[in-house]
């Protein structure tokens, strides 16, 4: 049952992650002129590694499910750390949290394969800016992305009390990666839709 849930959750997370990536280049009728005219290469870069990342995440989930299944009285449970102080794993309200976590693990994998993660497993400013601006020759877009990535990294560092000299645990990596991705997507969307001002 848990294995079936894990596979279902992985599929939902992949769809959610793919849909969110489409928002990274919202060129359309509502976009101001001379903004976001060129699509960044981030979608192509994700497409190149997403299948491999999906397989890695599925393998990890199956391994985790087997460990849970064979554990006596649930005393050994890696995922419990992630849900500490929260609701029981089987509670129905956890489903969206699980999907979010799996999508975050996918993004962490994508970031890792695009050199946007440091040696301790944390997303980096230079790596993320390079990933999200590759293929775009627009100063305003670059500056908006730089500001957005900086703000998002600072926000997640504060939220998760990140100490960058410490190695990130797997559950932390996934949650941080999702929040960083979600935040950067919002910032880029704000810029492309004209809700964020250019630097002149």
Swiss-Prot record:
Keywords for this entry?
Disulfide bond, Olfaction, Secreted, Sensory transduction, Signal, Transport
GO biological processes = sensory perception of smell
- Extract the signal peptide range: 1-29
NADP among keywords: no
Cell location? Secreted
Give TM regions.
none
Specify where it is mainly localized: secreted
- Note the superkingdom of the native organism: Eukaryota
Q: Name one Pfam family in it.
A: PBP_GOBP
A GO MF annotation of the entry reads:
odorant binding
Q: List the disulfide bonds.
A: 105-174, 152-183
The record's GO CC annotations read:
extracellular region
Q: What is the annotated role of this protein in its UniProt record?
A: Present in the aqueous fluid surrounding olfactory sensory dendrites and are thought to aid in the capture and transport of hydrophobic odorants into and through this fluid.
**Which family would the database say this protein is a member of?**
Belongs to the PBP/GOBP family.
Q: Which PANTHER family match?
A: ODORANT-BINDING PROTEIN 59A-RELATED, ODORANT-BINDING PROTEIN 73A, ISOFORM B
- Name used for this protein in its record: General odorant-binding protein 70
Q: What is the originating organism of this protein?
A: Anopheles gambiae (African malaria mosquito)
């Amino acid at each position: 049952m848990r294995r079936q849930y894990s596979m279902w959750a992985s599929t939902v997370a992949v769809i959610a992650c793919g849909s969110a990536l489409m928002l990274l280049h919202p060129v359309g009728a509502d976009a101001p002129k001379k903004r976001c005219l060129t699509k960044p290469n981030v979608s192509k870069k994700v497409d190149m590694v997403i299948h491999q990342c999906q397989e890695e995440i599925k393998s990890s989930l199956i391994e985790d499910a087997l460990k849970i299944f064979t554990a006596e009285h649930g005393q050994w449970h890696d995922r419990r750390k992630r849900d500490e102080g929260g609701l029981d794993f089987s509670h129905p309200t956890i489903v969206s949290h699980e999907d979010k976590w799996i999508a975050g693990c996918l993004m962490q994998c994508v970031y890792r394969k695009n050199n946007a993660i440091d040696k301790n497993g944390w997303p980096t400013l230079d790596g993320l800016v390079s990933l999200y601006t590759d293929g775009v020759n627009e100063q305003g877009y670059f500056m908006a992305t730089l500001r957005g990535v900086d703000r998002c990294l600072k926000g997640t560092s504060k939220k998760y009390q990140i100490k960058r000299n410490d190695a990130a645990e797997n559950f932390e990596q996934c949650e941080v990666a999702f929040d960083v991705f979600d935040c950067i997507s919002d910032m880029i969307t704000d810029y492309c839709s004209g809700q964020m001002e250019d630097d002149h």
